[in-house]
Amino acid sequence: MEESNPAPTSCASKGKHSKVSDLISHFEGGSVLSSYTDVQKDSTMNLNIPQTPRQHGLTSTTPQKLPSHKSPQKQEKDSDQNQGQHGCLANGVAAAQSQMECETEKEAALSPETDTQTAAASPDAHVLNGVRNETTTDSASSVTNSHDENACDSSCRTQGTDLGLPSKEGEPVIEAELQERENGLSTEGLNPLDQHHEVKETNEQKLHKIATELLLTERAYVSRLNLLDQVFYCKLLEEANRGSFPAEMVNKIFSNISSINAFHSKFLLPELEKRMQEWETTPRIGDILQKLAPFLKMYGEYVKGFDNAVELVKNMTERVPQFKSVTEEIQKQKICGSLTLQHHMLEPIQRIPRYEMLLKDYLKKLSPDAPDWNDAKKSLEIISTAASHSNSAIRKMENLKKLLEIYEMLGEEEDIVNPSNELIKEGQILKLAARNTSAQERYLFLFNNMLLYCVPRFSLVGSKFTVRTRVGIDGMKIVETHNEEYPHTFQVSGKERTLELQASSEQDKEEWIKALQESIDAFHQRHETFRNAIAKENDIPLEVSTAELGKRAPRWIRDNEVTMCMKCKESFNALTRRRHHCRACGHVVCWKCSDYKAQLEYDGGRLNKVCKDCYQIMSGFAESEEKKRRGILEIESAEVSGNSEVCSFLQYMEKSKPWQKIWCVIPKQDPLVLYMYGAPQDVRAQATIPLLGYIVDDMPKSADLPHSFKLTQSKSVHSFAADSEELKQKWLKIILLAVTGETPDGPSEHLDTLDNLPGPKEKSEC
């Protein structure tokens, strides 16, 4: 029977009650102090001895500000009810009904904090006969600070307490243990005297917590299966039966989800629930999970049709308004958690790897001689095989999610969302312009079957790009180029377009070349007819071959690499002779030499401007003029630069003329001659210097440029200046050999004529 409790104490009567309390303490003859001393002694002897409510109410000497909690009267009322039901037993110790208890109740009414601490300091009071005392738990939880409360809330949400599942007997105890595991707290830790004593977890406790986690995650999983089976599937099937779309489509999307749901909700989850209630006598889970093995075939069927199911959802959403309307209506509900149907369809795929992870953790803590060892090990072997298939499907789903993100970044204009498309690499890069010397910012998306060459566009939210060119992997070739002015460059040559790109570093360049080449190799392995299409890097020409003219986009020679027309060799100027590019070979030509048009296959057969030579080849006409025999000046710069002893830009001055920047080359085929060009791609040299017999002076005067040297012979004086001392020494090393008739590879055939010359060796020594 409930005892009558004193009315709540008002603020106005606090002083009066405090006087009454003082009088009671005075007439008890120091009972307060003695009680406090007894508590200290008892706590020192045994920290785990349960304390009476009176003792706990007097141990706290420092008042604390606590969060809102139930009133002391309410707590006492609940406590009295429990005492009446269980023979006035609290924590296994008889609670004496005496005048001292009445006085304690009065003190509790005056000091709610002490009563709250009383409940908090009694760990066993949280459970009475295996059932949680909710009132006491609420009081104990109020002792923790706001950080612990937030952590507890997060833990509860993680455990799936809002899944809408019916509560089972014993579940509150299991959930509390998992909550303690995640928060790093225990009910005993609430006692101030126990705060400095850390209890190390035993292996048995760790195994129990793993089993508890398995149970709680299984509950959450069953809830998601119910969402797929009982909500999405049923609602869409109802709409299909109205004739909005074929019911067969719905069955293909959800496959055998109903069978999977029935197995987990009617067999596996109840088995785990029962086992956790019997854990004290049967601490094992391996035997239950081993029963899962025959049903993994259901997951194999689901995984096999997963790609097609996701693609079908995408197509139905785009093409069938009724399908889109039903799915969006369900996705707005709270139970969906703001996730799409595709995300929930991934749940069965993710569950098998989850079993594998928990079993691995379980076996690490389990002793090899434990009764559950063999069952757990067999279960892990079977589940690991199924998990490998699920992981593959997960990777595909993640790739599909990434494709959707890129699809949005490209303004939803490129149809790239396809399970067969796989993103290999993406990133910023610079594109070297052919019209000028600037490097333009670009962005590349490399897939397993194509390269998207994109231009950034302005966007207030996120990164947005416009696709400039789509280059297919089929027929693509990669060339590592070397350019002193533009480091870290490489060339991507495809049927649709050829791009000269500049990476941010040598490492970035190597990563791009590796990714591109691996994509090309993988593509040709999938298509055996192209297995011989990949040539070695040294065999890949920088220019389009005659047979490929019009079929493959050429690399455009940059404007600043030539000073004259690459066909007629006339010098360019800004007014009367401007630069034009042949769309077939990429050469820079003048307007006279580019006054032709031809259909180019790589551009869809459209007419494009081409040079005279390409027009004659593509039209099938023979050359109208026989090529004249080339003189020494008509050797192309690119021809000798690619096979030279040394080549670079140098500053050059002859006699009293001003300094000018020229491209200098000493070719391997003619190592005793210095060729001077206006630019690296010129087809005609401006001048040549036979080096044999020249005197080298590498001591510049104060008026000369730094890092300069001179070549003198009779009245001819040629002054050169390099950009660095290292480059200067590189040139001098080759020139000092050439002026004596020697070559870097050994004595030259011209050495026989040196005896007839007036001592060039002596003159060249510096």
Swiss-Prot record:
Family annotation (Pfam families): FYVE, PH, RhoGEF
Swiss-Prot/TrEMBL keywords: Actin-binding, Cell projection, Cytoplasm, Cytoskeleton, Guanine-nucleotide releasing factor, Metal-binding, Phosphoprotein, Repeat, Zinc, Zinc-finger
Tissue expression notes: Detected in brain, lung, liver, skeletal muscle, kidney, testis and cultured hippocampal neurons.
Subcellular location per the Swiss-Prot or TrEMBL entry: Cytoplasm, Cytoskeleton; Cell projection, Filopodium
The keyword Cell inner membrane appears for this protein: no
Disordered: region residues: 43-167, 745-766
Binding site for Zn(2+) 1: C565, C568, C590, C593
Biological processes per GO annotation: cytoskeleton organization; filopodium assembly; lamellipodium assembly; microspike assembly; positive regulation of JNK cascade; positive regulation of JUN kinase activity; regulation of cell shape
Modified sites of kind Phosphoserine: S702, S716
Zinc finger (FYVE-type) boundaries: 559-619
Extent of Polar residues compositional bias: 43-65, 132-145, 152-161
Single annotated GO MF: actin binding
Residues of the PH domain: 422-521, 643-740
Main subcellular localisation: cytoplasm
Gene Ontology cellular-component annotations: cytoplasm; cytoskeleton; filopodium; lamellipodium
Entry keyword ATP-binding: no
Annotated binding of Zn(2+) 2, by residue: C582, C585, C611, C614
Residue intervals of the DH domain: 206-393
Actin filament-binding: annotated segments: 1-150
Coiled-coil residue windows: none
Quaternary assembly: Homooligomer.
Role description: Activates CDC42, a member of the Ras-like family of Rho- and Rac proteins, by exchanging bound GDP for free GTP. Plays a role in regulating the actin cytoskeleton and cell shape. Activates MAPK8.
Entry's free-text remark on domains: The part of the protein spanning the actin filament-binding domain together with the DH domain and the first PH domain is necessary and sufficient for microspike formation. Activation of MAPK8 requires the presence of all domains with the exception of the actin filament-binding domain.
Protein's UniProt name: FYVE, RhoGEF and PH domain-containing protein 4
Origin species: Rattus norvegicus (Rat)
